[in-house]
Design a protein with these regions (language model features):
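Conserved Class I SAM-dependent methyltransferase catalytic core
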Residues: 30-43, 195, 318-400
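Active-site catalytic pocket residues across diverse enzymes, especially alpha/beta-hydrolases
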Residues: 48, 232-236, 336
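Flexible, glycine-/basic-rich loop-and-beta segments that form/coincide
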Residues: 389-502, 506-509
Length: 658
């Protein structure tokens, strides 16, 4: 892959600097807290210096006519107009290094404070100020600044796209070294490209000058947002007005996103905070949304705050507290524009859990039900494993849309793209595979080979919307099922009902229902039974077979003996009856199957339905399973005989006698 070699020099310089300067003074887990901000500051400075030199050339005649102070004012004013920031201190990282170690701490702080407020908030949230004292006390602040002043991260040397890759690779290496958890990773560029293509942006939808809004609720360093904007401007309409929105919970990652988008001159609004309980875009709706939220990550500690700030977003159902990824899906759904206003499209990456976790009536199933029955789920694409940097698990792109074309209404497409990959020339953490974009060679030999473009192949399968080896089309109800709770009557080996004795309490107001007392004798016994002045005793009656008790407990008894207990002036009644032995059972029945026929076929015993719920699950792999028949017995026997002969020959050659 071309970018693997393009970024290796910068990454190696930064990585080696971290190891050389910080080792034995900071814990390895602390390296990113220092290196990320310094990389960020060096990049910001590189953009500032490059723009300043450009302006000096453009304004050479004007600047030559004024003194140095006025020149500085003119340049600072121009910088604010063109790149929205400047630095009024007299320092750069090179000048800090040139002045030596004596005043490095105070000079560095002055340098940081010289930036405009929009950069200072990025620097503050990057966390570097928390480490300045220790860096200075350990005599390594000067070394760090000196080494980084020699690493050229200017736009002329490192393009915006390349800078994103540099940072991505640093995050991957630090995460790998620190055993970061599997869900927290960068999204590979080919996955982002596939997602943006699947959003189905086109010239008809995005007209010249039209405002297009794109949102990522877990935007990380902003890579998806930038890629989506690039896609619109390069492939669809360069004159579209694209506004980016995002939210990120991590201070340092937010700082990277904010800086990256600011340096690119993007119109972007990146809010800081936890999307689930600090909705930074409350009341907003967006045209396109894409995200790769954390999966397999517990939200138990924030559950109360999340539900308190739900504002209806999560009322439909809550997933298990051990995995909150579906909450991001619900959050994005809440940001969809109504279909009559053009609607919205969502592409989101999940692991396998949201496909099937949770029973009928549970949070995950209710969320799937909500999405499917509203006809928002358009497509799910199974991606190759070993595609992400810090995890090799199976992942899926869910495509949701509330403005489906007519042919897709009421339908869901599953695309099995697990085999659409090429091996990496060298592994990047857990990433050993990539979805090929058709670019072959590098440098002057770089060329596009359409036949090798696996992204395009997947997109074509999606657009074709046809059944095939990699594509299956389903109705909504193909993923629905009934969860039926049953009472089964146990039988013995001869098929006769197994009964047990059960003691039950009888309310006094139910006596006449249980005991009709039609005969004179029954009336007499009933009077004695209900006499509060009588003694503890028991009475046998003819049992009303249509009584609530008989029907509820399915007793076959013809009579019932009721025991009377007198406590003061109060009476209590109990009886022991013979009832069938009941076994609890649960059956899961496909929604399209006839319930009665299914139970009659599957259940031999007498059954009674006690509860029924509708659920949804998407057993993706089941629908693409290809049965491999067992080989003929004779072939297997012959192969075993041949192997045995080979073993005997080998043993004879070794001089082993049997």
């Amino acid at each position: 892959m071309k970018r693997d070699t393009e970024i290796s020099n910068e990454v190696a310089l930064i990585w080696n600097t971290a190891n050389d300067v910080l080792r034995d003074i900071f814990q390895r887990t602390e390296y990113p807290d220092i290196i990320y901000p310094i990389v960020l500051i060096r990049r910001i400075e590189g953009v500032l210096i490059a723009k300043t030199e450009e302006l000096k050339t453009q304004l050479a005649v004007q600047l030559a006519k004024v003194d140095a102070a006025t020149q500085t004012n003119i340049l600072n004013s121009k910088l604010l107009q063109e790149i929205k920031f400047n630095n009024i201190s007299s320092y750069t990282m090179q000048k800090l290094a040139d002045e030596g170690e004596t005043s490095i701490k105070s000079n560095f702080i002055s340098y940081l404070n010289g930036y405009t407020d929009n950069i200072k908030i990025i620097i503050d949230r990057s966390g570097i100020r928390n480490h300045i004292n220790k860096l200075a006390e350990e005599k390594i602040l000067f070394m760090l600044i000196k080494d980084f002043s020699q690493i050229d991260l200017s736009p002329q040397k490192v393009s915006n796209i390349k800078m994103g890759y540099v940072f991505e690779e640093l995050v991957r290496k630090f995460s790998e070294a620190n055993n970061a958890e599997a869900g927290e990773h960068y999204t590979p560029r080919e996955v982002i490209d596939l997602m943006t293509h699947m959003l189905d942006m086109d010239e008809k939808a995005i007209k010249k000058g039209q405002l297009v809004t794109i949102y990522d609720p877990a935007c990380g360093s902003g890579g998806m947002l930038s890629a989506a904007k690039e896609f619109i401007e390069e492939k669809i309409n360069p004159d579209a007005k694209v506004v980016l929105y995002g939210q990120e919970v991590n201070d340092k990652t937010w700082a990277v996103a904010q800086a990256d988008l600011l340096l690119k001159g993007e119109t972007a609004y990146i809010t800081k905070g936890d999307t689930l309980y600090e909705d930074g875009t409350a009341g907003e709706q967006f045209d396109f949304m894409l995200s790769n939220p954390p999966y397999g990550k517990s939200w138990k500690k924030i559950q109360k705050k999340v539900m308190a700030a739900s504002n209806g977003r999560f009322d439909i159902g809550q997933p298990r507290s051990s995995d909150g990824q579906l909450l991001f899906t619900l959050h994005m759904i809440s940001k969809m524009k109504p279909s009559e206003m053009g609607g919205s499209a969502i592409a989101i990456v999940h692991n396998g859990s949201p496909l099937f976790s949770g029973d009928a009536g549970g949070g995950e199933s209710e969320i799937r039900k909500y999405i499917i029955e509203n006809d928002w789920l358009e497509t799910i694409v199974a991606l190759p494993t070993e595609l992400f940097y810090n995890t090799g698990i199976a992942t899926y792109i869910w495509l949701l849309r509330n403005n489906k074309p007519e042919k897709r209404k009421g339908k869901i497409q599953l695309i099995n793209a697990v085999d659409f990959w090429k091996p990496m020339k060298r592994s990047l953490g857990n990433k050993r595979r990539r979805i090929h974009n058709g670019i072959e060679g590098s440098g002057e030999n770089e060329r596009y080979v359409e036949a090798n473009d696996q992204i395009k192949q997947i997109i074509n399968i999606h657009k074709a919307f046809e059944e095939g080896p990699y594509s299956k089309i389903f109705d909504h109800e193909d993923f629905a099922f009934r969860k039926v709770s049953l009472d089964l009557e146990e039988t013995d080996d001869n098929g006769f009902p197994v009964t047990i004795l059960k003691e039950i309490a009888i309310a006094s107001n139910k006596l006449l229902d249980i005991v009709p007392a039609k005969t004179t004798n029954d009336k007499k016994l009933l009077a004695e039974l209900t006499n509060k002045k009588g003694k503890d005793d028991e009475y046998t009656f003819v049992l009303n077979p249509k009584s609530e008790l008989a029907l509820k407990h399915k007793t076959a008894d013809r009579t019932i003996t009721i025991r009377k207990t007198v406590i003061g002036n109060k009476l209590s009644f109990k009886a022991t009856i013979t009832i069938p032995k009941i076994v609890k059972d649960t059956e899961y029945i496909p929604w399209k199957a006839n319930k009665e026929t299914f139970l009659q076929k599957e259940i031999e015993k007498n059954w009674t339905i006690t509860a029924e719920e509708k659920g949804y699950e998407i057993p993706f792999t089941k629908h693409f399973y290809i049965y491999q028949p067992l080989r003929e017995q004779a072939i297997v026997v012959n192969e075993m005989a041949e192997l045995e002969k080979e073993n005997l020959d080998l043993m004879q050659q070794l001089g082993i006698k049997l």
